[in-house]
Amino acid sequence: MQDAFSRMELLVGNTGVKKLSRAKIAVFGLGGAGSQVAESLARCGVGSLTLIDHEKITLTNIGSQVLALHSTLGMSKVEAAKKRIRDIDENILVHTYETFYNEETAGMFELRSFDYIVDTMGTLSSKLLLISRAREGRVPVISCLDIGDKIDPSRLEVADISRTTACPAARIIKKELRKQGIRKLKVLYSREQPAKEKLFRRRRTMVKKPAKGNISFVTGTAGYLLAGEVVRDILSAGNVSHS
């Protein structure tokens, strides 16, 4: 008898489907990559998703974020994601936190309750805190590094942070993690050289760029790659839902 995940079962088997259905995954950050991760995991039959983001959907999100539609403008990202995900799989458990992850809010989350953590947050201090807490709890974590100002999705790569190249964010994070004795971390990053041009032309005048640029096929590809890593790691691991 067919169900929503019958085609996936042909690929991963009944045991794989059961592993995913028991998995509890947290996604911190629902921007372009994070929102795609959450949706992709839902389409893989993951049993429980916890979504954390403090932002609301704006018009500028439409170009790069799967949650952003004219009908969702002004909605919190976590609520838009929950509604969309429950429309994909009505049986999935979705927990949402409309909050900014930092020292003040970190206590809200018992990280040991998760089988896997995905970090797609843009704030360096939040990333470092989450990575550190996840390591303390011995919870697998994958971190998406800076993919802004990139236009070539074929240059995206998953690697240990020690093997990254052409990524200024990786150098900073490596340095900070070493201070905590952390030398290994699975990350997604781009091998594309960062843009050197800090100015862009607007009405015949060179002005400083107000923010980093992004584009749908880079953020979307990043999300798919992250989700793929999570799913493959869960399938290759032992029992999940240890809590």
Specify the residue positions occupied by each region the protein language model found:
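Hydrophobic/small residue at the entry helix of a nucleotide-binding pocket
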Residues: 33
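N-terminal charged helix/coil linker that caps or initiates catalytic domains
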Residues: 1-25
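Glycine-rich phosphate/adenylate-binding loop
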Residues: 21, 109-116, 121-126, 136, ...
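Conserved S-adenosyl-L-methionine
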Residues: 43-48, 136
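Conserved N-terminal Rossmann-fold NAD(P)-binding element of oxidoreductases
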Residues: 27-29, 52
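Glycine-rich phosphate-binding loop and adjoining beta1-alpha1-beta2 segment
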Residues: 51-88
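Conserved SAM/SAH-binding loop
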Residues: 98-106
